[in-house]
Amino acid sequence: KGARLQRALISFFLDAAREAGYLEIQPPYVVNAASGYGTGQLPDKEGQMYHCNEDDLYLIPTAEVPVTNLYRDVIFNESDLPIKNTAYSACFRREAGSYGKDVRGLNRLHQFDKVEIVQIQHPDHSYEALEEMKAHVQSLVERLELPWHILRLCGGDMSFTSDRKSVV
């Protein structure tokens, strides 16, 4: 039952993102170091990432890493923006376990699944895009009739490239 529920939820979130104008991407689960640096995961979060020594590659901590790196060397015209992508992926982090007062009640795993939405937007419109994405996620949680709240992360929980970050 759990596997079918998970598959249904993944489809629900991907379908809703596509209906909201996001292009679905099937990201790779293994990336090079340049991809990690390009999204601020490296060097900041290297201790939480799994490294494949023989090939000098990393398992993705989030689909954001390969999705945004699809555009790493692209220069956009303003008329091309926004670029909206969604992706489902397994994610891999070394932060497994349940520990400490800050994660009470959470059971952290080495592997977990996520559906992400990503926008590439002109800097003048980035905060507006962030609010749009938060509203999109909130509407989905409400459609599922789940209780929710927004947690705004503090600076110590974000990569050095982040200005704001929220979790619904």
Show which residues each predicted segment covers.
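TRNA-recognition modules of translation machinery and tRNA-sensing kinases, especially anticodon-binding
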Residues: 1-168
